[in-house]
Amino acid sequence: MAADKQQQQAPVAFNPADPPNIKAANFKDMLPVDVITILNQNIDELDYTKYTEDEISEGLKQLFMGTARTMVSLRQRHLKSLVRRSDMFAQNDASTWARPNIGLKRTFPPRFMQPISED
């Protein structure tokens, strides 16, 4: 039971009820699930009437940048377990002649296709 309670508690790196004090740098050792847990725990306490529109916007910007930082951190922690990234641009392969000069591997099919209408 204590393990469940400990698992639900997220490290407090920001207070969603105080947008001017949300800083992306404070999200350094957090996971995305920690951010969601903090937001869910404080959902009923949010009252932004005492803050200006600029303070709220800056707080949201910092929240999004901090959350993105947690996602990058999570990916880096699991780098050895992930599928290797593939090149976005096409290499020399059998269908190189059929692709436009840009050669985006996953964007352009080797031929033009048109759906057949039943009308």
Curated annotation (Swiss-Prot):
Q: State the organism named in the record.
A: Equine herpesvirus 1 (strain Ab4p) (EHV-1)
Annotated membrane-spanning segments are none
Subcellular location(s) of the protein: Virion; Host nucleus
Residues folding into a coiled coil are none
GO BP terms, alphabetized: viral process
Q: Which HAMAP family match?
A: HSV_SCP_alphahv
Please provide one cellular component term from the Gene Ontology annotations of this protein.
host cell nucleus
What keywords does the record list, in alphabetical order? Capsid protein, Host nucleus, Virion
Q: What does this protein do?
A: Participates in the assembly of the infectious particles by decorating the outer surface of the capsid shell and thus forming a layer between the capsid and the tegument. Complexes composed of the major capsid protein and small capsomere-interacting protein/SCP assemble together in the host cytoplasm and are translocated to the nucleus, where they accumulate and participate in capsid assembly.
Gene that encodes the chain = SCP
Assembly state and interactors? Answer: Interacts with the major capsid protein/MCP.
Q: What Pfam families does the database record attribute to this sequence? A: Herpes_UL35
What family does the entry list?
Belongs to the herpesviridae small capsomere-interacting protein family.
Name of the protein: Small capsomere-interacting protein
